[in-house]
Regions:
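N-terminal subdomain of nucleotide-sugar transferases
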Residues: 1-63, 180
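An aromatic- and histidine-rich active-site surface loop
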Residues: 19, 85-100, 114-145, 150
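A conserved catalytic-core segment of Leloir-type glycosyltransferases
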Residues: 40-102, 106
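Nucleotide-sugar donor phosphate/pyrophosphate-binding loop at the beta->alpha transition
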Residues: 124, 136-141, 149-173
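A short, active-site helix/loop in glycosyltransferases that binds the activated sugar's phosphate group
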Residues: 168, 172-192
Length: 192
């Protein structure tokens, strides 16, 4: 429950200044008295160009409307399967390394109480949340906005393909590790 003040670690590949609702959710949690830190990537959505003022190859720490934001190295989003996978896995790897570091702690120097994973594409963005859960034994709440690997079908991948089967395995592993999954559609519950 969020009645008591919590220290919340948010894992999401995209965050302000990128146009995603998770920014509003985090700012509302701060307004309600919770401590919130976001672990995100370099802003580059949707064009695949890192936004002006954000350095390539550097971790950037800032506070946006009361939310502490840590930006992890991310290869910008590009078209093409290989480039898209590099984008997905660069964030997954760098965010996981960060959450396991001594630097990823709440303002009191202790672990966060809960991890909130705002899951858009790709599902692998949840790897950092799982790593934090495993290290500190805290729960993960996932807000699932993009169902994997089903979202790959919209991109022309067939269910019989090796790519689909691989990401089906990855997705099942990730979804099983969540303590709670919030969904945007009742149809998601049939899959999850």
């Amino acid at each position: 429950t969020l009645d008591a003040k919590k220290k919340i670690l948010v894992v999401c590949q995209y965050y302000k200044p990128e146009p995603f609702r998770v920014s509003d959710i985090c700012e509302e949690m701060v307004r309600r008295g919770h401590e919130v830190q976001v672990v995100t990537g370099y802003p580059n959505y949707p064009e695949g160009l890192i936004y002006e003022g954000y350095g390539k190859g550097k971790h950037i720490d800032e506070v946006i409307n009361g939310v502490r934001v840590h930006r992890c190295y991310t290869i910008p989003r590009q078209t093409g399967s290989i480039k898209r996978l590099l984008n997905y896995y660069s964030y997954a790897a760098s965010s996981t390394a960060y959450v396991l570091s001594k630097d990823c702690v709440a303002s009191d120097g202790k672990p966060f109480d809960v991890v909130f994973c705002n899951q858009l594409s790709p599902v692998m963005m949840a790897d950092a949340a799982i790593a934090y859960k495993n290290k500190y034994k805290v729960p993960i709440v996932m807000y699932c906005l993009d169902l994997w690997p089903e979202s790959l079908i919209a991109g022309g991948i067939t269910r019989s393909s090796i790519i689909y089967k691989y990401f089906h395995y990855v997705s099942e592993r990730i979804y099983r590790k969540m303590d709670k999954i919030l969904i945007t559609s009742r149809m998601f519950s049939d899959y999850l």
